[in-house]
Amino acid sequence: MELSTAAKNPRNAKSPKKVVVFDYGFGNVRSAERALARTGADVEITRDFDKAMNADGLLVPGVGAFAACMRGLKEARGDWIIGRRLSGGRPVMGICVGMQILFARGIEHGVETEGLDEWPGAVEPLQAEIVPHMGWNTVDAPADSELFAGLDADARFYFVHSYAVHDWSLDVHNPLLRAPKVTWSTHGKPFVAAVENGALWATQFHPEKSGDAGAQLLTNWIGTL
């Protein structure tokens, strides 16, 4: 059997990308770990500061209440880690509440909690007859999306949430800056389903639970690291 060039010369083989799933107590860390490992990444679940800072990619899952997730994130110094990584252009990806906490604030039961304020906007209760939004749904991604590259327009992703961002208010007027790419979905009223903003990407849905479509999406992210 003929060996590939990389197999003949191991120094030519690419090392797998190191990804840390940040473990701050609020997330499906094991399912995220398994899904990322299937892309070929070297994955570790940890809250270790140095490992989270030095990984090729940092994935921040999130399940539960916005306020509780923010408390857990701050206790684990995750807010500082995310900020430092982004200031250095190091990739970060948020999932579900891990996306929501990237916005300016969350409003639950009339109580407002400050988020990380990477993007303006409020996470509010879904405006729909049936809440939570639980199950499979399509998304409307920009034509030049890197996150959804190779995916059909009718690809479906798995959502479980009662809160969402309904209004995107970040406008970029400087021609030297690239505007974020925003993907939408609809449950009652349209809401933000994903954002691609330089080194910071995020999804409201769970790619780790979204079958082949989710696997392709995670592969796309790993490919940018």
Give the label of every model feature segment.
Residues G64-W136:
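Cysteine-nucleophile active-site neighborhood
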Residues V43-N54:
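Short acidic low-complexity segments
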Residues A52-G62:
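Short acidic/histidine-rich motifs immediately flanking catalytic phosphotransfer sites
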Residues A104-H187:
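Pocket-forming structural segment of enzyme catalytic cores
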Residues W184, K189-E196:
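Short, surface-exposed beta-strand/loop micro-motifs that present aromatic residues
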Residues E2, A7, A199-L225:
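Acyltransferase
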Residues K14-V20, L200:
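Extreme N-terminal starter segment of soluble prokaryotic enzymes
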Residues V19-G40, E208:
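N-terminal beta1-alpha1 ligand-phosphate binding loop
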